[in-house]
Structure formats: structure tokens, C-alpha cells
Amino acid sequence: MHRRAIYPGTFDPVTNGHADLIERAARLFKHVIIGIASNPSKQPRFSLEERVAQVNLVTAHLKNVEVVGFTGLLVDFAKEQHASVLIRGLRAVSDFEYEFQLANMNRRLSPDLESVFLTPAEENSFISSTLVKEVALHGGDVSQFVHPQIAAALKLKVAQIQLDKEGK
């Protein structure tokens, strides 16, 4: 347990599935960096600063976990953080093909960077940030999929989106 690992993602918002993988990674590695990508191409609902704060809230009890926002290539961020392992989550077989391609690209760009795949607990295997946002946007209750304060933040965000639509 000597390696520094990075669990990268957009975390828009952080879900119970993410939290499950972070807990697992924290048991496996000496130091885990949650790398929150700015990722403007995904048009996140929450700002980078909001997402960093949300993940800090969810991981506050884990002493070997650090949350850092970043822009640019993940392999460059990993080098800056002196990390030798990338943690990626696999919810279903359908995730594997994309993750396999990504792991090979990262290995080509940074040969010393290893990808490790973790699977969430069965009860979290279907949860994605995209689905959580869709449920919230349609007025559904997301409290079973995210931390209570994240559910409240999503509710406020949805209300703001609706106000913005009405104002146009």
C-alpha cells in the first residue's frame, strides 16, 4: 500500500456509487487523490468549485483522501500529483470497452501509469451522475442515490434552471 492513486471524474454530482468506489480505493492505497476534471465539454451543472466542495463533503471522514480540481490531460495531472495508479469504475460490461480504450491511451501517453478497475457494490451499480440529474430535472427524489446535502444542492440547481428557462 505505497502507491498514490488518482480517481478522476467530473462528479457532476458525486453519487453514492462514486462514494463507494472512493471508500474502496481508500482501503487499497496509501493516498487517494480525487481528481475533479473541469470538463467543459460535458457542460457540468455544477461549477468546478462546487463539485470540489461536494466531494470534500462526502469524503471528509477519509483521512487519506484529497480532492483536487484540474484542467488539461489526466496523465499530466497524474505526473504533477506523483501518482502511479489511475482508478476507474466499471458499473457494467458496457463500460469496459470505453475504459479499456482509455487505459491503453493513457498507457501510451504515460507508460508508468497503471489503470486499476473497481466495481461498485451491487446496489450502486446502476447509479450514474447523468441518471441522477435526469431524475432530479423531472422532479424525482434522488435522496437514495446521493448524500443528503448533494440532493438539496441538486434541488436548488433544478429550481434555478427552471427559473432561468421561465425568464427567457
Curated annotation (Swiss-Prot):
GO terms for molecular function: ATP binding; pantetheine-phosphate adenylyltransferase activity. Pathway: Cofactor biosynthesis; coenzyme A biosynthesis; CoA from (R)-pantothenate: step 4/5. ATP binds at T10, F11, H18, G89, L90, R91, E99, N124, S125, F126, I127, S128, S129, T130. Its cofactor is Mg(2+). GO terms for biological process: coenzyme A biosynthetic process. Substrate binds at T10, K42, L74, R88. It catalyses: (R)-4'-phosphopantetheine + ATP + H(+) = 3'-dephospho-CoA + diphosphate. Coiled coil: none annotated. The record marks H18 as: Transition state stabilizer. Signal peptide: none annotated. It is an enzyme of class 2 (transferase). It is found in: Cytoplasm. It comes from the Bacteria. Keywords: ATP-binding, Coenzyme A biosynthesis, Cytoplasm, Magnesium, Nucleotide-binding, Nucleotidyltransferase, Transferase. Its EC number is 2.7.7.3. GO terms for cellular component: cytoplasm. Its main location: cytoplasm. InterPro entries: Cyt_trans-like, PPAT, Rossmann-like_a/b/a_fold. It holds the Pfam family CTP_transf_like. Reversibly transfers an adenylyl group from ATP to 4'-phosphopantetheine, yielding dephospho-CoA (dPCoA) and pyrophosphate. Homohexamer. NCBIfam families: coaD_prev_kdtB, cyt_tran_rel. Belongs to the bacterial CoaD family. This is Phosphopantetheine adenylyltransferase. It comes from Shewanella frigidimarina (strain NCIMB 400). The lineage of its organism: Bacteria, Pseudomonadati, Pseudomonadota, Gammaproteobacteria, Alteromonadales.
